Amino acid sequence: MIDSPRVCIQVQSVYVESQSIPEEERYVFAYTITIRNLGRFNVQLLGRYWLITNSNGRQTEVQGEGVVGEQPLIPPGGEFQYTSGAILETPLGTMEGHYEMVDHQGQPFQTAIPVFRLAIPTLIH
């Protein structure tokens, strides 16, 4: 878990075996992110940046507006949770990045998304 001055990010990831096709180098993962506003004022998530790295070292950058079609306004003490997914060519990889956010005065800031592992269960010891 990593804390910015106002926001805490928590991540959980799982392998989605039913949608994966290992013989075609298709490994599907889902991740659930909880964004908590620990501050005294509203914050809003406007965009995201991801760096996805597979176990061969291949990196993919993803940028976009909001998350899952939303730009949530998170009140003080509140949280926003969503689930999304990633497809890798390898059974192991990582994701990390940041959210582009604004505070209650419209001032932009970034909140780091801690690096987390994407791995099929048989690779986790």
From Swiss-Prot:
The record, for NCBIfam families, names: PRK05461.1 (NF003967)
Give the Pfam families listed for this entry. Answer: DUF525 (PF04379)
Which InterPro entries does UniProt cross-reference here?
ApaG_domain (IPR007474), ApaG_sf (IPR036767), Uncharacterised_ApaG (IPR023065)
Any one GO biological process: error-free translesion synthesis
State what protein this is by name: Protein ApaG
| Phylogenetic classification of the source organism | Bacteria, Pseudomonadati, Pseudomonadota, Gammaproteobacteria, Enterobacterales
Q: Where is the ApaG domain?
A: 1-125
Record SUPFAM superfamilies: ApaG-like
